[in-house]
């Protein structure tokens, strides 16, 4: 009985040792780094919207100063007309239809365009301005990427 138990124990230990993955010395591994060219963007369009016009104006001046300090070429600044949302509601729940309330929100929209930037510059710029975005302001970003012509079209 003891021989059976000891043989089971050694069998389990040897199986567990066999299933362990072989250790690899980090010095033996070859570190291969692929050098990829940085992306080029002809324009990065930043659209930001909010309900307070003064906050958007302040954030616009912040964006312009960031572009100036980081020496990023700035394109056009566009202030779009606001979007008005009106929801009529009855004052009381069931009666007196002539007594109504109007709930209204206005969403102000601004667009700023950044011209001729690399991918790393664009990502750093966007990370910085998104960390400093004020409360109640939403942002949408669009990229226009430059790509080389395919080999079938290129002139030799």
Swiss-Prot record:
| SUPFAM superfamilies, sorted | Ribosomal protein S10
Gene3D superfamilies cross-referenced by the UniProt entry = Ribosomal protein S10 domain
Claim: Mitochondrion is one of the keywords in the record: yes
Name of the protein described by the UniProt record: Small ribosomal subunit protein uS10m
In terms of InterPro entries, this protein maps to: Ribosomal_uS10_dom (IPR027486), Ribosomal_uS10_dom_sf (IPR036838), Ribosomal_uS10m (IPR040055)
Gene field: mrps-10
What protein family is recorded? Belongs to the universal ribosomal protein uS10 family.
Say where the protein is mainly found: mitochondrion
Entry function: Ribosomal protein required for normal mitochondrial function and normal larval development. Thought to have a role in insulin/IGF signaling.
Keyword Ribonucleoprotein: yes or no? yes
What is any Pfam family matched here? Ribosomal_S10
- Observed phenotype of the null mutant: Induction of dauer formation and larval arrest. Reduced insulin/IGF signaling.
What are the record keywords, sorted? Mitochondrion, Ribonucleoprotein, Ribosomal protein
Localization, UniProt: Mitochondrion
What is one term from the GO cellular component aspect held by the record?
mitochondrion
């Amino acid at each position: 009985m003891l021989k059976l138990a000891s043989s089971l124990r050694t069998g389990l230990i040897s199986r567990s040792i066999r299933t362990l993955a072989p250790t690899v010395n980090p010095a033996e591994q070859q570190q291969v780094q692929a050098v990829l060219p940085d992306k080029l963007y002809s324009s990065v369009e930043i659209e930001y919207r909010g309900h307070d016009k003064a906050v958007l104006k302040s954030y616009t001046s912040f964006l312009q100063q960031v572009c100036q300090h980081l020496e990023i070429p700035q394109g056009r600044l566009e202030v779009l007309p606001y979007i008005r949302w009106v929801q009529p509601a009855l004052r009381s729940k069931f009666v007196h239809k002539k007594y109504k309330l109007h709930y209204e929100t206005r969403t102000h929209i601004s667009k700023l365009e950044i011209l001729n930037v690399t991918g790393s510059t664009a990502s750093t710029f966007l990370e910085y301005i998104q960390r400093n975005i004020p409360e109640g302001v939403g942002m949408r970003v669009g990229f226009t990427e430059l790509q080389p012509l395919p080999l079938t079209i290129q002139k030799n």
